[in-house]
Amino acid sequence: SYITTQPIKTLKGFLQDWCLSDDEWLLDGDKSGKKYKLSELDSEHDRDKYFYKTRWIKEESIIRTDKGDRKKIIEQKLIVSYSIKYRDYQRHVRQGQIERAIKIVASGEPINKKKVNDPKRFIKTYQATNDGELASQAVSYIDTSVIDAEEKYDGFYAVCTKLDDSKESIIRKNKRRREIEEC
């Protein structure tokens, strides 16, 4: 049994759509079963609340053994959570990275390798004239499409598990993990 983080970006399209969909969210600690829409949440009133939804998924996985690799279907529970507080935290961190990227562009520093959390991931370099001819100098700028693409995942956090624990127990464990990551 395990609980492991699940990047939403790496899920199949229909699962990403389900994870990011606006409706069918439950409120942690609310026993009524009332469903919420994320678009109807209040940034102040619902700031400290923790919303979630869950479903079973089947994923094909490659199991590596001494006798070679083999494919196996793994059935596991996908739990996605959403928190306005976590969304705001992620936006705050990104804003600092964007400000560093702006300074890099302004300094004329060369844009080398871009890592996952490197501010340089927001920088795009263009080395052509308006006519499409190769230019002698490259122009770097902040690519807002990268920012927009990341922003759609703000506030969401997903885990997969095979634990037999209750949803509430798994969500509490997940919440503690996320709080540790914010430190």
Task: Describe the role of every protein-language-model region.
Residues 1-183:
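Anion-binding and metal-coordination hotspots
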